[in-house]
C-alpha cells in the first residue's frame, strides 16, 4: 500500500513550480482507444506530469501522447494546471452526448481570463449548451464566487487573499453525500517559491506549510 501512495493524489506541485489539480465532472468517463498510444489513468497521469513536466506546455504535450482512461462509470474529470512562469490551462475530454457516450476529444483551453478557475462542470465552448457544461449547476455557485473574487483583485491575489477566497467557497459536510459536496482540504500554492499552505476540513486556525528544496 505504501508503494501506491505516490499515485493516490488529487493535486500537487513539483520542484519546478508546475502544479496540477483534478476535479470531478458529471457524465460518462473518458475512454480513449487510439491503438497507437499507451493508456494512463487519471492519477497515474498526474504522477507522470509532476515527475516529468516543468511547464504547462510540456504537460499538455505529454498528455496528448497517451490515451486517457477514467475508471469510474458515472463521472469524468478535468485538469487545471499552472506553472511558475504564470502560464495556466485547463484540459478537458469532450464529446457529444456525454451523458450516454464516453468523451474522447482532448481539448486544451489556454490563457483566457474566464478559465482561471474551474469547479465541476465543463468549461469548454464546445460543451456550452450541454447538460454537464453550460447548462450544469454542479459547482456553479462556487465558480461564480471564485470568478468574482479573482476579478475583485484583478487576478493578482496575495496568499492571504487567496485563502480568504477559498474560505468563501468552502462547503460543510452537513447533509451532503456527494464527494464534491464538502471541502476536505484547502490549499494555496506559491509556484515561484515552490511552497504550499494547507487547511484540512475548514479548520482555518490549523495551517500546515510545506516547501520543496530545489
Q: What are the functions of these language-model segments?
A:
Residues 1-7, 11-51, 74-77, 82-214:
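C-terminal, well-structured catalytic/ligand-binding subdomain of enzymes
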Residues 46-70:
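Short N-terminal edge-element motif at the start of the domain
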Amino acid at each position: 500500500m505504501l508503494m501506491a501512495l505516490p499515485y493516490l493524489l488529487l493535486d500537487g506541485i513539483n520542484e519546478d513550480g508546475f502544479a496540477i489539480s483534478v476535479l470531478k465532472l458529471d457524465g460518462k468517463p473518458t475512454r480513449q482507444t487510439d491503438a497507437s498510444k499507451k493508456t494512463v489513468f487519471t492519477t497515474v497521469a498526474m504522477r507522470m506530469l509532476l515527475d516529468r513536466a516543468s511547464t504547462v506546455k510540456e504537460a499538455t504535450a505529454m498528455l496528448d501522447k497517451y490515451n486517457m482512461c477514467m475508471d469510474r462509470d458515472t463521472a469524468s474529470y478535468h485538469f487545471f494546471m499552472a506553472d511558475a512562469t504564470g502560464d495556466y490551462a485547463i484540459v478537458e475530454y469532450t464529446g457529444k452526448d456525454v451523458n450516454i457516450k464516453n468523451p474522447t476529444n482532448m481539448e486544451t483551453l489556454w490563457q483566457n481570463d474566464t478559465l482561471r478557475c474551474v469547479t465541476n462542470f465543463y468549461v469548454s465552448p464546445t460543451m456550452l449548451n450541454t447538460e454537464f457544461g453550460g447548462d450544469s449547476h454542479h459547482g456553479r455557485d462556487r465558480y461564480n464566487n471564485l470568478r468574482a473574487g479573482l476579478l475583485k483583485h484583478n487576478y493578482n491575489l496575495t496568499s492571504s487573499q487567496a485563502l480568504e477566497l477559498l474560505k468563501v467557497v468552502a462547503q460543510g459536510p452537513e447533509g451532503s453525500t456527494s464527494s464534491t459536496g464538502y471541502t476536505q482540504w484547502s490549499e494555496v500554492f506559491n509556484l515561484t517559491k515552490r511552497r504550499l499552505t494547507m487547511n484540512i476540513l475548514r479548520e482555518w486556525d490549523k495551517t500546515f506549510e510545506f516547501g520543496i528544496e530545489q
